[in-house]
Amino acid sequence: MTTSTPHKTRSTRDIFNTRFVFLMAAIGSAVGLGNIWRFPYVAYENGGGAFLIPYMVALLTAGIPILWFDLAIGHRFRGSAPLAFRRISSRWEGIGWFKVGVNFFIAIYYAAIIAWAALYTIKSVTQAWGDDPAEYFMGDFLQAEPEATYSGHIVPSILGVMILVWIVCIATLATSINEGIGKLTSIFLPVLAVMFIILVIRAFFLDGAAEGLNAFFTPDWSVLSNPSVWIAAYGQIFFSLSIGFGIMITYASYLKPRTNLTNTGLVTAFALSLIHI
């Protein structure tokens, strides 16, 4: 599937220098909590290794087709989600803004999680959490009340890092697609891959690692008749591939005018699925 773009937008839209840079940006936008944190426990709760069957079905029947759809819209109409949908029909522009709204709320809690991770990276040098990580996280780190479900208390150290995170994000978005997102993802995604490999190797030597691996890779085939397992698989696909959020629409708008979207979508989808497993 190769698409061409409207003539009037070809000279006014920046483009990724290479397909590799686009792939790094696309994969980097999807690799996160949905891959590293959410997928393992969803698989564990839904039959372990057997969950891979509904997951692969969901990938082939929903994930890849919707990813192609996002890529095609962004590439054909050369704009962010609201602009792309408006160019299709003014009545559809609201769909694009809905996607922007979803991403706005995601960015709010992701900034907090990134701040936590950055601070924990520093504190890991001395293992500041000691023998009781849970108590340290809720008490010393978040400074939250034991029974509180919500607190308006501001933790200066976390706030400072969050402000820094937002400054970096805004500065990145203010630069060109290649000098900003393209360059950063091309550098930090390989770094993430190395860190992830180290984390996995470290996890193999933790107490209970063998039991966890056995639980994950021992399939419970009986769950395949449970509709909730299939619903969980299809839900996971949206987290895993970052589809339906308008992100891939925007990224695809920066692809070269003549691009093989079929191959690009397949590489992106299967690369992300490999990371999960």
What are these regions (language model features)?
Residues 276-277:
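Conserved small/polar residues in nucleotide/adenosyl-binding loops
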Residues 43-69, 95, 157:
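Extracellular loop-to-transmembrane helix junctions
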Residues 58-62, 102-108, 114-122, 161-174, ...:
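Hydrophobic core segments of alpha-helical transmembrane domains in multi-pass membrane transport
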Residues 10-13, 42-46, 81-98, 113-174, ...:
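Inter-helical loop and helix-membrane interface segments of multi-pass membrane transporters/permeases
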Residues 1-37, 66-71, 75-87, 94-98, ...:
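Membrane-interface "cap" regions at the ends of multi-pass membrane proteins
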Residues 13, 40-43, 170-176, 232, ...:
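Helix-loop junctions at the membrane interface of multi-pass solute transporters
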Residues 2-6, 11, 185-241:
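Helix-loop-helix hairpins and the membrane-proximal interhelical loops
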Residues 18-58, 211, 247-255, 264-266, ...:
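Transmembrane helix-boundary motif of multi-pass solute transporters/channels
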